[in-house]
């Protein structure tokens, strides 16, 4: 989405001295050779976890590339960094969650590499790390848990289905969100993981079409949670003064037909295209009809 295969080939040429015209398949082989040596030499490997299994204390990692397995097996020390919401009750629950994650994430029945890691290398074992550490992150997750209305967002299994379905994400990409979690789920949880006043704008980066809710693997009501974030931002006093004034004027106008009819096309154009210059910086100017729908209706049909 952000880089073409030509961009990647040029990057490899600049950093690794390879041919700038390599195909994607050839680039993959180059990356494999370079990275494999890095894994062999590494002292510490850091991975995440798709799930943490409560009854055994094991970590479950699912992937298609095999990088996670290499990070856990080759280095002497393996560090797992994962959120507290990744805990599932038992090993048997993987029979549901692994296929669910694969199907909604990539359309597969199951991903290529599925690994359960229960600790460092034991006596008489030939591979694995000497030490293993699991770091459980809160980082605002208990804030979400304490909020009854947004709590369901912690159900997320990070399949990415909502990102693939979101028209906003498909047009602007993930880097635009400037945060760890992008797309609809990122817009829902980031204001609570960080600071609502600073990140409330993410909840407005949505058409509220509901595609995200429709495709969610665990049935999180995402578009309603985006509205909840907007509501909380306003009730907690994070709405700008100019926005409050604008909505009050809008409300007064909507309750008075004479005001609405008085605002002809020229006036609307001057207000929107003149005062809202940021809107037209990257868009065409909005063109409004000279008469309102109400005026046109009366001219054509009278008062019926």
Please provide the spans of the model-predicted regions.
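Small/polar loops that bind or transfer phosphate-bearing groups
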Residues: 82, 158, 217-218
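The feature marks the mature, well-folded catalytic cores of soluble enzymes
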Residues: 1-149
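Short linear elements at protein peripheries
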Residues: 267-304
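Exposed alpha-helical structural elements
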Residues: 7, 11, 26, 30, ...
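Short, contiguous, pocket-lining structural segments
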Residues: 86, 154-158
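Extended amphipathic alpha-helical segments enriched in small hydrophobics
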Residues: 159-163, 209
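Short alpha-helical basic/polar micro-motif
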Residues: 55, 164, 214
